[in-house]
Amino acid sequence: MIQKHAIPILEFDDNPQAVIMPNHEGLDLQLPKKCIYTFLEEEIDRYAQEAGAECVGEFISATKTYPVYVMDYKGEKVCLAQAPVGSAPAAQFMDWLIGYGVEQIISTGTCGVLADIEENAFLVPVRALRDEGTSYHYVAPSRYMEMQIEAISAIEQVLEQLGIPYEEVMTWSTDGFYRETAEKVAYRKEEGCAVVEMECAALAAVAQLRGVVWGQLLFTADSLADLENYDSRDWGSEAFDKALELCLEIVSHM
């Protein structure tokens, strides 16, 4: 039932059925339960080719076609897909993957830091502040999305087994890359946000509505810690390969 509100983004309909469902095309496609869904530029395509993964389908958007790969990892089939940047397209593609069989998903990608955190450090978001729009179409309005314990546990278990240091953080999920004003950044820091990115809250909301498991491993890129001197650094490029390898290990523990 729809909950009406003067502000449209705060209106929510809890009916999981919609006029257009993710699998409305009726494709002959059955994806494995486990999935790596990453924000790693072309790293997924390169890795899929090197690992001999099979391209089993495509997600076609108005501007780009995203290959969907399946590979064997430690005796299990795992789906690999490159996530588009931004809450709306990332949520749409992930919802489509779920519609065709995916149930356990690990994402990875960069984040900007609001605190003094070195580049290429691994972080585990446990809560996301919902300053994007997409999550409000999947979960009733609230200030935060809480991450799923099952996913957090799998991520942290692998990091600890491999001796990789990490921190649990609250992240600020925003649609406004060029609207991270000095006052907003300061406000988010006061509230406890250590990093900023664009998709975490939305993907957590998709997973909650669809009843699947999703978690994210972030690694640090640019820095907004000094409001007077923005530092793009090297966008976390040194961590790309390691992050993908970690995701495969994490999803195998789920």
Walk through the language-model features, giving the residues of each.
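Accessory terminal and edge-of-domain segments that mediate assembly/interaction
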Residues: 1-106, 112-254
